[in-house]
Amino acid sequence: MRASQSPMLDPRARQLLRTLIARYIRDGEPVGSKTLAQHAGLDVSPATIRNILADLEDVGLLSSPHTSAGRVPTAHGYRVFVDSLVQMQPPGEEEVRRLRAELASGNGTQSLLGSASQMLSAMSHFVGVVSAPRREQFAFRHIDFVALDARRVLAILVFADNEVQNRVIEPRRAYEPAELERVANYLNAQFAGRALADIRACLLRELRMAKSEMEQLLAHSVELASEALVPADADDMVMAGQTRLMGVQDLSDLDRLRELFEAFASKREILQLLERTIQAPGVRIFIGEETGMVSLEDVSLVTAPYAANGQVLGVLGVIGPKRMAYDRLIPLVQTAADVLGAAMQSPGAR
């Protein structure tokens, strides 16, 4: 539920809801009217506070556990809190310094993604997750072809971020080593520094306009490049800190925890969720059932896209219990996205 769908609350109700949720996030215990009377900073009687809490419960922002006289926020209550009540606590200078040091430019892309997920986990005490950029967004630096036998060719592809991929391709006909060398030299001379997604289309355009003496080389280049430069299936997401959730009180239901870890293992559902946020600017938050996935109904995700050279590359974030310190984690995730994007923008990463 977004802020526009939230019930209208008067200033006293907003202050009580803010105080109650902040106390519950901090202590993990239902919050009663006596505690609120002491900490909400309102000059009202306990009876008035109880009436306001009852109203907040009636509109679905709070619930009352059977074993306690206090109240706890619902997913709807958390949504109102993060949309309009939370008071952000940006990361301190030391945290920002740690992020920049760990995500220093010059590291390869996979190393940066791993470091980012580990730092998010360490700084949030929950799960850090980073979706990987698609390889077709990256420029290639160099390509070589090696004949393995009469029908198979090894393509050795070096990307601008220093990642190397070896791909075995099976052209329609056998190629002599000299032919493979000519094609590699042509591709390196004409297309080094170009994104994979652009190269095949350029080759096809050039083939249509080519003079007869170039047609054979271009035709060979199109055939080999069509297979060698197709983005390979990759590890599309890097996660760290999954086991941290095993000690979280709010996630103590073993059956639900098993479903959550199955989602971590398959990655598909979490990747789908991250894909929904990749074109949305700034931080997006999914709370419980807002994820649309049963396995994630007990957790929240705080996500933000990261970009380099004006292009969104992927999404990073934190997965944790709904009772998380949103005031700290929302700005932390945004800062991590900014730092990772800056590192990816450096020549060593892209």
From Swiss-Prot:
One of its GO terms (biological process) is negative regulation of DNA-templated transcription. This is Heat-inducible transcription repressor HrcA. One of its GO terms (molecular function) is DNA binding. Pfam families: HrcA, HrcA_DNA-bdg. Negative regulator of class I heat shock genes (grpE-dnaK-dnaJ and groELS operons). Prevents heat-shock induction of these operons. Keywords: Repressor, Stress response, Transcription, Transcription regulation. InterPro entries: GAF-like_dom_sf, HrcA, HrcA_C, WH-like_DNA-bd_sf, WH_DNA-bd_sf, WHTH_HrcA_DNA-bd, WHTH_transcript_rep_HrcA_IDD. Belongs to the HrcA family. The keyword Transcription regulation applies. The keyword Transcription applies. HAMAP family: HrcA (MF_00081). Disulfide bonds: none annotated. PANTHER family: HEAT-INDUCIBLE TRANSCRIPTION REPRESSOR HRCA (PTHR34824:SF1).
